[in-house]
């Protein structure tokens, strides 16, 4: 079992190795995890090494390598042109303290959960913009309901009157149905993803912005795939 910080560090080291070819320095790790001292990084490194996720190599600078990633939080993104993250699943049934199945979460004391940030969402972005995991987000477990979840970074003001601002991070439960009035991630023509309020307009689907500068857009049902429902957001000040 990993804590959120341990998993964040493991993923940072893994991604740094893939992109740069060498492990990050302790200073880079400290900055990435927003820690104030290297001692916190040393403790996380030691914990990851004890659990068999990384290995320290003697007599070498930046001598850390990733041995393995936790199986339950390895993300396998579909090559299909839609949002299809194989994300962490949370099932809020009661679990015995001795249970080895933690509902596909790596949880510390069942208080925090880690979900993937799957890119950025705007009024209409190419679906490829939200298919790639860019980071992870640590959340209180009671913020998450049944189902699979992921996060997206908002990059426009089309939903501002619904309280969703540019640079907010939204939490989405993956589902393919919605009730009129709910805010959803919609895939249009398998090409374009957008965050809008879901409405019915006769036999058609209306995607409604929460900003008078954006028009409501009407589509035939076969052009729209619902990819998830908004369940919460996080804002940094």
From Swiss-Prot:
GO biological process, one term: negative regulation of DNA-templated transcription
Keyword DNA-binding appears in the UniProt entry: yes
Classification via InterPro entries: LexA, LexA-like, LexA/Signal_pep-like_sf, LexA_DNA-bd_dom, LexA_repressor, Peptidase_S24_LexA, Peptidase_S24_S26A/B/C, WH-like_DNA-bd_sf
EC number: 3.4.21.88
Reactions this protein catalyses: Hydrolysis of Ala-|-Gly bond in repressor LexA
GO MF annotation, one: serine-type endopeptidase activity
DNA-binding span(s): 26-46
Quaternary data: Homodimer.
Protein name: LexA repressor
Originating organism: Bartonella quintana (strain Toulouse)
Originating gene: lexA
